[in-house]
């Protein structure tokens, strides 16, 4: 599996200028600081929606792609219609049939979706795609990638009806995950995320 980042649409100068417009300040037309990006991403103020990412997962299993299609942002998959492809009969196609998935979510969409898909209760195969995307996005937008965290880290505790206890076990390993400071909690999670990938 490999996430291919095709394009980042919008830019941080626009986000900064949109924020300034809401308080009747003139645009600056410049890239904001890393500190500003981190703060606005954690605050989840509406100007962050001006930036989106177009990405592709090639040959993803159909059933995994359908987990992603349940989220409400632009996405496309290969047609399975028999008059559009000849790889298999649509009526006979297995759930594991490979398709290409193209996504086009904005920042807010990814924050909301990845909270669910990085969760340890999500299908492990689907979670691996979430992790791969987070890692690929980091090369283009590190501050954005860093706010993609599981719901338990986002909330500071597990909200699931059937708690998997992952968060509690991770807090035992790294108490900073229980911090009431959101940036501290996210930094602790991201440190663990990157250590697990090496």
Predicted feature descriptions by range:
Residues 1-198:
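Family-specific signature for flavin-dependent thymidylate synthase
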């Amino acid at each position: 599996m490999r996430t291919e980042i095709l394009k980042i649409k919008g830019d941080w100068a626009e986000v900064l200028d949109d924020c300034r417009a809401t308080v009747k300040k003139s645009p600056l037309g410049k890239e904001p600081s890393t500190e500003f990006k981190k703060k606005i991403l954690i605050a989840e103020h509406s100007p962050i929606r001006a930036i989106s990412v177009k990405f592709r997962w090639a040959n993803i299993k159909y059933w995994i792609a359908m987990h992603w299609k349940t989220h409400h942002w632009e996405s496309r998959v290969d047609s399975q219609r028999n008059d559009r492809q000849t790889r298999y009969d649509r009526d006979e196609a297995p759930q594991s049939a490979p398709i290409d998935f193209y996504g086009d979510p904005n920042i807010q969409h990814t924050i909301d979706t990845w909270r669910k898909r990085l969760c340890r209760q999500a299908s492990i195969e689907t979670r691996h795609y979430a992790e791969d995307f987070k890692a690929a996005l980091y090369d283009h937008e590190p501050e954005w990638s860093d706010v993609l965290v599981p719901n338990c880290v986002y909330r500071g505790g597990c909200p699931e009806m059937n708690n998997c206890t992952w968060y509690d076990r991770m807090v035992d390993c790294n108490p900073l995950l229980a911090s009431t400071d959101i940036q501290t909690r996210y930094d602790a999670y991201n440190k663990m995320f990157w250590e697990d990938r090496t």
